[in-house]
């Protein structure tokens, strides 16, 4: 599976992506809104979880790579999450901090939304984030998402 934009290629993760993904998901700034940055085992598990999602659902979080160089700069895609007691399709994204404020998250997320509506049964996607995650909230707004509800869930 490959999705392309003007600047990006989104593709399935492989085990060879570990080093680049570890650099992103182990960074305390990137993972500020998670309980803690990911360690080696958690990143390996993240890749495996997404590979299982590709098999089980036909989607997951995909590697976000620069089109001109192939450099992996993040992830973006759809996962099934328990939101308010319901299993719902959630769009998520993480971008390497060296590539923040350049529109890569919104560019990747916009093409993922288009892909999801064309290739899945879903007619609605969700973005579940910690209330204080202003950058992610702004990205969600930029791609046309609307706030539906706030949850009193401190861990998320």
Task: Explain the meaning of each model-derived region.
Residues 29-49:
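Conserved GNAT-fold acetyl-CoA-binding loop/helix
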Residues 51-63:
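A short helix-loop-beta-strand connector motif used in the catalytic cores of GNAT acetyltransferases and
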Residues 49-51, 78:
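Short, P/G- and charge-enriched loop/turn segments at secondary-structure junctions
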Residues 38-42, 60, 87, 132:
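Short, conserved alpha-helical segments within structured domains
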Residues 41-48, 60-61, 98-100, 112-115:
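Low-complexity, flexible helical/coil segments
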Residues 1-32, 65-156:
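Acyl-donor (CoA/ACP) binding surface of acyl/acetyltransferases
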